Amino acid sequence: MRRTAIIITMGLTTIPVLAQRTKNTSPEQTKPSTTMETPKGYTYGKVGASPFTMKDLDALKATVLFGPEDEKYLRMAGEVLKDQTDAVLDLWYGYVGSHPHLVHYFSYKGQPDMEYLGAVRARFGQWIMDICNRPYDQEWLNYQYEIALRHHSTKKNATDGVQAEPIIHMRYLVGFIFPITATMKDFLAKKGHSAEDVEKMHAAWFKAVTMTATLWCQPYVNEGEF
């Protein structure tokens, strides 16, 4: 595969949006893949245990009103999104690139690290599929804690061996819930589903993103206070 940089410019910052294209094919000939290569640094099922228990997760699910119907509509969303992940990531990376205070977390001495951005992008695409298709079991819970540690100073930059800001501040984990939710609805509506199905997919996505962002905040909170 040949990695092609597509430049997106928004606001004051320009960053490349990295997309995969098969060698010797034109953009018109390239169709979105329905399968994803395992991203570098993606270690699902190979991480330590989360201190958050399944009982705790059940209570969190109840708090955001997440139930079996949401699981059903997340699976539907996974089918809708599986060939749109690059487009979703283009939009999200454009959003990050348009805000210097966000791209700052992927930078060293004021310069964005393009390889780092590319590696994170690949895992971000996998996260979209995981949030839709993975069962929210102990293995999933463990990996949310691993993701949390990779945002926190505990493991920030370690996965990719880069020099960049040593922590992503918790306020942006929470603040990012809205743009990641608000921008998804148009993508969910692109495959001809009824308005009701789109609303239910979007609601399930919102609940799932809220839960995962909440779980990612755990390392930032004093023991016993999360």
Write out the residue ranges for each language-model feature.
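Short N-terminal segments immediately surrounding and downstream of signal-peptide cleavage
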Residues: T22-M36
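Sec-dependent N-terminal signal peptides
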Residues: I6-G11
